[in-house]
Each structure stands twice: as C-alpha cells, then as structure tokens.
C-alpha cells in the first residue's frame, strides 16, 4: 500500500527540534517522495499572525446574523433572510479561517512548540469560559429546584410535570459518552507512541518496516471512528428523548431549564463530533504525527469536557432533580 508522506518534510524541517531546520533529511527514504513545496519557513518560534481578511468578514457576518435576528423578532421584513444569510456566512468564515490555520500548521510549519504552548493556553481558557457558561444554567436550575416557589406548588419537580426516567435513555447516553471518552483516549494513546521515532529516522525502504506506522494509523483511525459513531448515536438518542418527552420548553421553569441545559450540551456534542470528524479526515490524510497533533489534542480536550458536563447534568437534572418517583416510571 502506497502512503502519502507529503507532510513529513514539513514536520521535521519546521517542527522537530524546536521547529528550526537543524535536521538533515536529504538521506531519508521518504524525503524524495514529498510533492508539496513549502515556501514559508519561519526562523523564529513565536506566533506572528499574518494578514487575514477572515476576522473582518466574520465580524460582518455576525452583525448580519444578530441584526437580522432582532429584525425577525420584531416582525420586520426580510429579517429572517438576513439572519439566515449571516448564519451561513459565519459557517463559511469558520471553514475558510480554520482551513488557513490547518495550512499554517501542517504545510507551512508556523505552529512551533512556542506557538503550540500559546494555543494550548487559549484552548484551556476557552474551556474555562464554557464551564462558566454551563455554570449559569446549573445555577438557574438549582435556584428554582432548591427553593421552589408557591407558583410551582412548593415542590420539585413542579406539579403536572411528568419527568423522564433517568435509568432509561439518560443512563444509556451516559454509558455512550463514557465509552466514547474511552475510545478517544485509546486513539490518543496510539498516536502518542514514541516508538514511531525509530520509523521516522530510519533510512530503510522496506515495506515490512513501514507496516508498524500503517498499523498504528489504522488503529488510531478506527478508535476515532468509533468515537464519532458514539457521538452521533448520543445525538440520535437525545433527539428521540425530546420527541417522546411529555413536557416542552414553555412548561414553566422546569421545562425551560431542562431543555436549555440539555440542549446546550447537545449542541456542544454536535460541535465536538464535527471537530472529531475533521480530525478523522486529517488523520487519514496523515496530518498528525506523534509529536505534532495539537488540533487532535484540542478536540480530545473538548470531548472530555463534554463528557464531564454530561455526568454533572445526569446526576443533577435527571437523577436528583427528577425526584425518587422518576426511577420507578
């Protein structure tokens, strides 16, 4: 089987050994198979952002979306079309912007170790901001459930709400997400195997010697495929649960907090699944290596964050917030 080794030249010229050209690759068996010409090779290790039109265009798209949404809420003409156009422009800007980031990392060698440290800090701060986002919804739920008002009948769950059984679909979704966390960790463990270093620095052109790399990529891709499948399965079951539920988002504070919190988490699951799908295709195209795969690592961090949030959500809203009687329905 013939492999695509185009990315190897960039990885070892710009990433390995502090990402400066200190490694002579001319005698490596895969060097002469590279077909991509790398014009950009930075000689420093810092994150110098190049000129890009996407921040400006993304801001315009966000303005169109929010302005159109406000117009639609006030029944102004063409408000829905403006918000829809802004939404699709946001998706387009996300695609082209992240496409350029992938090019800078994989093909231009701009994501040095120093740059990756900054990116890691950025992802950590982003996840912390997401934690605060979910914290506000959990605060609303516990504010209403710990001291239910007279309007709710002074009980929780409120009178007239037929809550869901936590031991049915919610428990199944919990097991699905926990299993997906296991499979994505398995995939991450395989790609971080440092025994690949012997393969990369060998001059052998023997197909049997190349087999371990192919095997590791197959195992890594298979584990990642399982994770994506489990994420899609979780989304399907969550949608089925919404379809079968007897209460709606407008059924008081219970319905609003339930659907807002679980729906927000479901949106994050969809985003995380798309993130992992992109990583899956990048993995197949050999964009990742044992010491240079931060894009995949960021997706794994995000997926584990989604797992942890669901555990808190399952224990608080589904189990504790539904009352003891819900276990026997």
From Swiss-Prot:
This is Cytochrome c oxidase subunit 3. It is a multi-pass membrane protein. The gene is COX3. Component of the cytochrome c oxidase, the last enzyme in the mitochondrial electron transport chain which drives oxidative phosphorylation. The respiratory chain contains 3 multisubunit complexes succinate dehydrogenase (complex II, CII), ubiquinol-cytochrome c oxidoreductase (cytochrome b-c1 complex, complex III, CIII) and cytochrome c oxidase (complex IV, CIV), that cooperate to transfer electrons derived from NADH and succinate to molecular oxygen, creating an electrochemical gradient over the inner membrane that drives transmembrane transport and the ATP synthase. Its EC number is 7.1.1.9. Keywords: Membrane, Mitochondrion, Mitochondrion inner membrane, Translocase, Transmembrane, Transmembrane helix. One of its GO terms (biological process) is mitochondrial electron transport, cytochrome c to oxygen. It holds the Pfam family COX3.
């Amino acid at each position: 089987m013939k492999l695509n080794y185009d990315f190897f030249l960039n990885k070892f010229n710009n990433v390995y050994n502090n990402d400066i050209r200190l490694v002579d690759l001319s005698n490596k068996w895969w060097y002469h198979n590279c077909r991509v010409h790398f014009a950009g090779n930075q000689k420093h290790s810092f994150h110098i952002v190049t000129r890009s039109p996407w921040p400006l265009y993304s801001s315009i798209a966000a303005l169109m979306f929010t302005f159109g949404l406000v117009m639609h809420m006030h029944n102004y003409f063409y408000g829905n079309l403006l918000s829809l156009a802004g939404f699709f422009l946001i998706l387009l800007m996300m695609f082209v912007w992240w496409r350029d980031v992938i090019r800078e990392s994989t093909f231009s060698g701009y994501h040095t170790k120093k740059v990756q440290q900054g990116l890691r800090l950025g992802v950590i701060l982003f996840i912390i901001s997401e934690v605060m986002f979910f914290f506000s919804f959990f605060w609303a739920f516990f504010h209403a459930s710990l001291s239910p008002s007279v309007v709710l009948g002074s009980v929780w769950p409120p009178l007239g709400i037929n809550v869901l059984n936590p031991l049915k679909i919610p428990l199944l979704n919990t097991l699905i997400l926990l299993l997906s966390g296991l499979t994505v960790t398995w995939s991450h463990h395989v790609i971080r195997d440092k025994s690949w270093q012997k393969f990369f620095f060998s001059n052998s052109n023997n197909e049997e010697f190349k087999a371990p790399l192919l095997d590791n990529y197959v195992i890594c891709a298979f584990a990642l495929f399982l994770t994506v499948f489990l994420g899609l399965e979780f989304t399907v079951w969550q949608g089925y649960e919404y379809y079968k539920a007897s209460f709606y988002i407008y059924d008081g504070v219970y319905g609003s907090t339930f659907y807002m919190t679980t729906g927000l988490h479901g949106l994050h699951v969809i985003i995380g699944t798309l993130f992992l799908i992109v990583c899956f295709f990048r993995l197949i195209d050999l964009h990742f290596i044992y010491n240079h795969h931060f894009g995949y690592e960021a997706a794994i961090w995000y997926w584990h964050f989604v797992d942890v949030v669901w555990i808190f959500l399952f224990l608080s809203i589904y189990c504790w917030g539904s009352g003891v009687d819900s276990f026997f329905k």
